[in-house]
Amino acid sequence: MGEYTLQTACGAVKGIEKENSILFQGIRYAMAERFEYPKQVTHWDGVYDATKQELNCFQYDTFRKEENDSDNFYYEEFRKGRTFLYEENALTLNIVRPLQGEDCPVLVFIHGGGHETGTVGELPHGDTEEYAKRGVVYVSVGYRLNVFSLYRSRNYGLFDQMTAIRWVYDNIAAFGGNPERITIMGQSAGAMSVTDLLYTQALKGIVKGAIMLSGAGMVPKMARPYTEDESKEFWDKVQERAGAADEHAFKELPAQEIWEAWYQVSREHSDMHHLQPGIDGTIIPKLPQEIRKEGTDLDIPLIVGVTSQDFMPYLIFELAYGWAKRNVREGRQPVYGFFFDRALPGNRYKAYHAADLWYFFGNMDQCWRPFEKLDYDLSAQMIDYVANFVRSGDPNGGTLPKWEPVSKRNQGFRKFDGISEGYASPFECRRKLWHTFLRDKGPM
């Protein structure tokens, strides 16, 4: 490995030349003060050192340390053995570009974590070289989380993500990327963020495709964006718990006191004020179902999907399927659906929520599980599909089995299990019950 320096519109930046790619870590795309909106970085002095490990925004592990939680499944699965560095407003991104090539399509990934945790460097997706091998520039975005993002439904984290995408659009050509061929991808809360970003006109013409893993669409009563007035009572309680007389006093408290107050109050509430983006007038200008009804959300090709052991998989599938059916009904851009049902080897947790990340990013050698040839082959196929989609808006190509979008003729989702090549429409009985319950509210 050696160093590699290139010139961007912001200035020179130094990365690491690896076997199959060039890696740039921790590039700051924006600056922000606490509870203020991000300002895009347009210039830096000297040579930006992107050879060092990236910083991540404040979260649970910053203050309480996950290794002390003996029953934390996702720590054991995704983060054990890695050290993460934290900063309150670590608005940074990582870029993995091919060794050669210009005008490469660009994949921007937004990590999950319930809007309260998560990093760009987690084992399944951190700095994967698989897309660079296929001629795709891969970008992973860090953004503000929990109270530092969601305070009073102002969506600081979503604005971070939008700013990161605009920074990529303005600068990715210097990294060999094509700014006119950007696809955004997210998992879980990251997929919900992608959903929210499709509602804003600010990214129209910039984002050409979207991929949503286990989080496409929202239900009004379960994940509906709140207005600032609706969430006022919750945030007033958080400030009171912190001993702050008003918003200004709350803002001036040490970060850990702010986070602890939010964490304690949020665990006492069954509603979702503490974990959901809100109606901000810009990214989410109004209720999403109103935007969808007006047809002003971005009409671009989509990939949506679920795992068979997702959290409430029948509901998540129904939401994703409802999105696809709406596009078919209204003659919008195609939606390619998938159903991940590979039983991961190693323990009783099989196709769990986020298990598909190992396959979509190919970092299997960093996992403790005894993956088999079937798993590596399935992963290569899934990555090929995504690389094709990022390149053209269609996952098909080469010798890959045909992946049909949802249509009047094809009512199923492409099954990924390493065995079959068919389509699935699972959980039909439970989905019908949910569909009846949601009939007047509807997947959006």
Language-model-derived ranges and their functions:
Residues 204, 213-326:
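Substrate-access "cap/lid" subdomains that shape
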Residues 191-203:
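Short glycine-enriched nucleophile-adjacent loop
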Residues 112-113, 156, 160, 188-191:
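Active-site loop->helix "elbow" adjoining a glycine-rich segment at hydrolase catalytic centers
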Residues 321, 325-444:
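Mobile gating loops/cap/lid regions near enzyme active sites that modulate substrate access
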Residues 154-173, 230-233:
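Alpha/beta-hydrolase active-site loop
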Residues 175-188:
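Alpha/beta-hydrolase fold nucleophile elbow
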Residues 1-155, 271, 371-382, 392-400, ...:
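Non-catalytic accessory segments of hydrolases
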Residues 143-146, 216, 341:
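Short beta-to-alpha linker loops that shape the active-site pocket of alpha/beta-hydrolase fold enzymes
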